[in-house]
Regions:
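C-terminal catalytic "cap/lid" subdomain
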Residues: 1-144
Length: 144
């Protein structure tokens, strides 16, 4: 896997991003526009719906836990969870940009509404490569 530093370019959804997606190029982006209670998590969930694809979220922990593992040593890893149960956990966190939860509440609602299979992984790119190549990976799966 050859990963290079991206060039940052401002392009609009209608004139640029849709065309890149149609060409099957990988697109990494933050929020596509300002929307209340939405972060780049929400944008990514909406893109997964638009592309009819799974949603893979890389974050600073290895998956979903019952509480913040960076604060609590007793945090329990959750390897699999339903959309409904995940949404309940997400809604316990008060929304704010930069919040410390694996997905924001708007993204959680989107993946539940559209039944998007979602993977929560840490920032180890070898682990991501394992998932993409259908090998054993460390992370959490959210699905029905």
């Amino acid at each position: 896997m050859d990963l290079k530093s991206p060039n940052t370019t401002r392009i609009s959804w209608n004139t640029g991003i849709k065309n890149l997606l149609r060409k099957n190029l990988v697109v990494f982006c933050g929020a596509l526009r300002y929307a209340e209670k939405q972060t780049s998590d929400s944008t990514a969930a909406k893109l997964a719906h638009y592309l009819n694809s799974p949603f893979i979220n890389l974050t600073n922990v290895s998956g979903l836990y019952d509480k913040n593992p960076k604060k609590y040593r007793s945090a329990k890893f959750i390897p699999e969870i339903s959309h409904e149960d995940f949404l309940k956990i997400a809604n316990k966190t008060k929304f704010h940009p930069g919040q410390h939860f694996v997905l924001d509440q708007t993204a959680a609602k989107t993946i539940e509404k559209y039944n998007i299979k979602t993977y929560i992984l840490g920032d180890n790119l070898k682990n991501l490569d394992n998932l993409l190549n259908e090998r054993h990976f460390v992370g959490s799966v959210i699905e029905w």
